[in-house]
């Protein structure tokens, strides 16, 4: 699968929007980047798939391809079911708006309806536990507070397919304990999970299938213990 080169330069929502506008006007000036190569991946209901590999191997690109974040120029993606993505947690936030207002913005970006967001708002506020800061502009938040709000919004919504890029670190020990419990509930409740991680111990605990990626290719696909052993051996090779 390949993508317009400009997509990799878009690190914020505003930049991504402008990159797409430039793409429409200057297609002849862009080249495509072949990020994922020579593979077919089929995931069935009930499969919790871990994705491992070195930095730059294509793990996160695969996840964002499934989510529809990257516009595919060549290749096809066929997804059946609703997607629940847990990555780029800060995407869609407006620094000048309050935490309460940003719950709406983030929820809409994740595909929730206004009615669904309204029904979940108090649960999100209680879980984030930001006190009176929920009505302050989020530009006044610490990084930990911002992550707590983002995590609370993102994990309050459900879908058939859970896409997860690492386990989120979300503040103090008390909140981390809540966050870990919620993550386990999401993992256990999802029909399909695709989990990108460097933690080989965790991937063996929560996944029933693991793939290893290298330079945009799937080089191993199978049982967690077998693929993790192959990965560790490959990492130790000269």
Label the model's feature ranges.
Residues 197-198:
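H-loop/switch region of ABC-family ATPase nucleotide-binding domains
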Residues 215-216, 231:
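Conserved ABC ATPase "signature" C-loop
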Residues 52-54:
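The feature captures the beta-strand-to-loop junction immediately N-terminal to the Walker
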Residues 221-222:
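ABC ATPase "signature
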Residues 203-205:
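A short, surface-exposed alpha-helical micro-motif characterized by mixed small hydrophobic
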Residues 1-34, 225-229, 233-236:
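Pre-NBD coupling/linker segments of ABC/ABC-like ATPases
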Residues 14-21, 104, 116-133:
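Conserved ABC ATPase "signature" region
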């Amino acid at each position: 699968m390949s993508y317009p080169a400009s997509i990799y330069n878009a690190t914020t929502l505003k930049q991504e929007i402008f990159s797409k506008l430039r793409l429409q006007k200057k297609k002849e000036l862009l080249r495509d980047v072949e990020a994922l190569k020579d593979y077919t991946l089929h995931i069935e209901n009930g499969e919790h798939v871990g994705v491992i590999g070195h930095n730059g191997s294509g793990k996160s690109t695969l996840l964002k391809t499934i989510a529809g974040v990257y516009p595919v120029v060549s290749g096809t993606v066929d997804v059946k079911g609703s997607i629940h993505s847990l990555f780029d947690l800060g995407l869609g936030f407006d620094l000048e708006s309050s935490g309460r207002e940003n719950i709406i913005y983030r929820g809409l970006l994740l595909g929730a309806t206004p009615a669904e967001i309204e029904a979940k708002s108090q649960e999100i506020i209680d879980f984030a536990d930001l006190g009176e800061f929920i009505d302050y502009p989020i530009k006044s938040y610490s990084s930990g507070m911002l992550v707590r709000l983002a995590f609370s919004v993102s994990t309050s919504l459900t879908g058939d397919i859970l896409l997860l890029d690492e386990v989120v670190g979300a503040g103090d020990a008390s909140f981390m304990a809540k966050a870990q419990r919620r993550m386990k509930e999401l993992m256990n409740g999802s029909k399909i999970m695709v989990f990108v991680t460097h933690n080989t111990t965790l991937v063996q605990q929560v996944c029933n299938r693991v793939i290893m990626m290298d330079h945009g290719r799937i080089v191993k696909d199978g049982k967690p213990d077998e693929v993790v052993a192959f990965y560790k051996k490959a990492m130790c090779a000269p």
